[in-house]
Amino acid sequence: MRNLKITIALFSLMLWVACGENVDTTERMSNYVMLTAKGETSFTEDVAEGIEVNAMMAYRMDKDVSVRLRIEGDDKNAVKTDKDTLVFKAGTKTASFRVLSNQKSLLAVQEVIRVVIDSCSDPKMTPFGNGVNITVKPNAEIPPLTDEQLKLIAGYKDQLGIDLTRMMGVSNCTVTIKFGNDDKEAWNEGKDTRTFIGKSIITLSDKATAETPVLKMVGNPMGMGSYIYEVFRKVTTEDKDFFMQMPVSAAVLQAVAYDYPKETFNVTLDGITLNRDGTLNFTSQMEDEYGDEVTKIPFDYKFSAWERMKKMAAEGKTVEVDEGGTTAEYALSDLLQQIGTLNPTYYLGNSNIATDAYGNEPSNYVTPMGKVDFKAGVMEFVFPWDFGAGGFLSDYINIHVVYTMHP
């Protein structure tokens, strides 16, 4: 997280220094070029639109310039960019391209690829940062409905007059995240909101009854799967100034043989209950990182490194932690619920969302709300959320998700 702040601050400083109107572009400092993903940072092979990536130079140039792009880590040749060379027209400092699937269904397991700037057309131009990491996953699998589920769905149509199949399978959504005033600089490049298009896989929950329809999002719930993984990494393995400086964190990562490109992170959301008035219940009473009962969005996380940590803890494994020149041995079972753990729930969605736990003025808190409108063909959610176990955000982030139903 602190590295993220430093990176943004450095690039902002370069922009400020480079923007003096009285300085000739032929005499200016190095023109740094940075790549950032717009919205989601993961997609499945069957998604045609891929991921949009923005490129920004520190200052405008008085002629057309370009950068050549290179993809690293794509061992299966599963993706491509829509442009090999990205052109910045004279007088502009932004351009964009897309990372696209080759639509060949080549992956059996996910891969993490990186798009970097390979070369620049002008000697003043210099790549800034490490490029953009994008996770490419195998084609999404839609769970088949059982005979019992089909019977329930038919019953809802007859008795309630609703067709649940309009919101099941792969459903498109638009996600808008609003950041608090004190958080937008560090977490959203100074912008108030971040909007992206997502897709979720939705099915009928095992909790559904003949009287009450209940949905389960089994893939990319709320369109936020890759965003959740992004912020989880930023407050753990990508936080070089705190998490990664803790000896216990280093010991745990070594013990579980953490390897980012090979790790998987999946999220589901069960218990979305449709009421007869069209409202949706989707919150639940859960424990926070301190063991207190609070209201949360019951996202369920499956993180491969955390699964290994739990297994090793159950087997009685220990780790050796360097404590200032001396070595101490700890049971992994004692580290499952403290800072340094790889448990996603320790860092994600920490605060109570039934009331405003931050108490800021103005506040970014919003009362959780869900509703469905079959006439308009939309399903909508609004809720507050946070991350970082209280050490990173100054307020909630405010999330608004709108699903478009099938015809």
Q: Where are the predicted features?
A:
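C-terminal motif of bacterial Sec signal peptides marking the signal peptidase cleavage site
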Residues: 15-18
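Positively charged n-region of N-terminal signal peptides that target proteins for export
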Residues: 1-6, 10
